[in-house]
Amino acid sequence: MKFPYRRFGGVARPVITLRLKWHSRSVRYDVLIDSGADECMFDAAVAEFLGINLEQGEMRKATGVGGQMVVYFMHPVDIEIGGRMHTIDAGFISRPGGPFEYGAVGQKGFFDKFIVTFDYLKQEIELKTRS
């Protein structure tokens, strides 16, 4: 599966749209494919839309960019990309300034499910499902 890079503020980024599912609810959601992220992280507003009780998940803490401590809650969700469904554990995080523009998919939950090729010159991402 190939996806074009998308522009945000004039900058090309490896952002794709996937479908997040939890029980009978689903939502299309933009995510940055982030090879530097340990886990998949999505905005708390998405959890709320899906009917996930945020604080019933496993609470974790991490240090974000700039050394700021952040708290997030892990929940199992399904992601659908290219018609294929994958169950992952994802962190949901609130941001005081409002929702994030897009989520992030990282090593656990994404790179362990797909072989990812970034081609910046072609402005293209290629995903191959691991067998």
Residue ranges and their predicted role:
Residues M1-S131:
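Pepsin/retropepsin-fold aspartyl endopeptidases
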